């Protein structure tokens, strides 16, 4: 599989071939993904919740994102690597936003993702001007859950719906190469997808986007809580628990280690 680029994303929009994205936060997971046909790996700030144990993503730092991006990049996957810009790494001013985006690229990402709508237009333009591809993110933006009044579906009112449409158009104009739409009503995501020339990526926004993204812990059945819009394709939590319990039993009953697991000195 050859390296996926942002041009491939745009092409898939025109050919109506769905784009597939999963999060990954470490080398072994990225190595497994590298042997699949997945289009893109998102090193998401969701690592704060599913890896570091925080209640939300607000405590994730640039140091965290750089470290995990490096780990994923060391697997040398052909998938497009997109790294999230964490909370307060791009909102303060465009100069620091460009610098932090550059640090993620130096860590191995092929593009960055940031949250927000039209208010991020100048920031997106500055990062793109610096030569760094940007993926946008609208709808439920987890870094802004306090302002949104919690984790909820966005677009219930006409005002919210109109703002989502405006945000998507402004971000496209600013130069994003694709747009994540999270936890909005399905008809809104469909409208946005039809209006934009860039690909849209849904998470909890229905089937009409140009692609889908999931947190890999949800897909593998590892999460403590799985959102209604996610699907678990396997229950690894149960498989891992069973393996650990079997190991305990084997050790206590002298069934591990067996002869093939150690060496004896020849007499």
UniProtKB/Swiss-Prot annotation:
Listed cofactors: Mg(2+)
* Entry's family note: Belongs to the PanB family.
Q: Which NCBIfam families match?
A: panB (TIGR00222), PRK00311.1 (NF001452)
- Tell me the superkingdom of the source: Archaea
Q: What this chain does, per the record?
A: Catalyzes the reversible reaction in which hydroxymethyl group from 5,10-methylenetetrahydrofolate is transferred onto alpha-ketoisovalerate to form ketopantoate.
The organism's lineage is:
Archaea, Thermoproteota, Thermoprotei, Sulfolobales, Sulfolobaceae
Q: In which pathway does it act?
A: Cofactor biosynthesis; coenzyme A biosynthesis
Enzyme Commission numbers on file = 2.1.2.11
InterPro entries xrefs: Pantoate_hydroxy_MeTrfase, Pyrv/PenolPyrv_kinase-like_dom, Pyrv_kinase-like_dom_sf
List the catalytic activities from the record.
3-methyl-2-oxobutanoate + (6R)-5,10-methylene-5,6,7,8-tetrahydrofolate + H2O = 2-dehydropantoate + (6S)-5,6,7,8-tetrahydrofolate
- Annotated positions binding Mg(2+): 45, 84, 115
Catalytic residues identified in the record: 182
Q: Where is it localised?
A: Cytoplasm
Q: Which GO terms describe its cellular component?
A: cytoplasm
Manner of cofactor binding, per the entry note: Binds 1 Mg(2+) ion per subunit.
State what protein this is by name.
3-methyl-2-oxobutanoate hydroxymethyltransferase
Per the record, the major location class is cytoplasm
Question: One matching Pfam family, short form?
Answer: Pantoate_transf
Alphabetically ordered keywords of this record: Coenzyme A biosynthesis, Cytoplasm, Magnesium, Metal-binding, Transferase
């Amino acid at each position: 599989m050859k390296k996926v680029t942002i041009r491939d994303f745009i092409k898939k929009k025109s050919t109506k071939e769905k784009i597939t994205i999963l999060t990954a936060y470490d080398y072994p997971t990225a190595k497994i993904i590298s042997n699949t046909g997945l289009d893109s790996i998102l090193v998401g700030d969701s690592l704060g919740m599913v890896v570091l144990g925080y209640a939300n993503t607000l405590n994730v730092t640039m140091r965290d994102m750089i470290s995990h991006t490096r780990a994923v990049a060391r697997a040398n996957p052909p998938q497009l690597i997109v790294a999230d810009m964490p909370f307060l790494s791009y909102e303060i001013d465009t100069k620091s936003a460009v610098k932090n985006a550059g640090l993620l690229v130096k860590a191995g990402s092929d593009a960055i993702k940031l949250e927000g709508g039209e208010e991020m237009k100048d920031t997106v333009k500055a990062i793109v001007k610096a030569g760094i591809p940007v993926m946008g993110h609208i709808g439920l933006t987890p870094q802004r859950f306090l302002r949104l009044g919690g984790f909820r579906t966005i677009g219930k009112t006409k005002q919210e719906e109109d703002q989502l449409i405006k945000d998507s158009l402004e971000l496209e104009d600013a130069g994003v190469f694709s747009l994540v739409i999270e936890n909005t009503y399905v008809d809104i995501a469909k409208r946005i997808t039809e209006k934009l020339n860039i690909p849209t990526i849904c998470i909890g926004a229905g089937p009409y986007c140009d692609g889908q993204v999931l947190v890999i812990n949800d897909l593998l059945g590892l999460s403590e809580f799985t959102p209604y819009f996610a699907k678990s394709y396997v229950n690894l939590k149960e498989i891992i628990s069973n393996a650990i319990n079997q190991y305990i039993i084997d050790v206590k009953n002298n069934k591990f280690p067996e002869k093939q697991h150690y060496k004896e000195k020849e007499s």
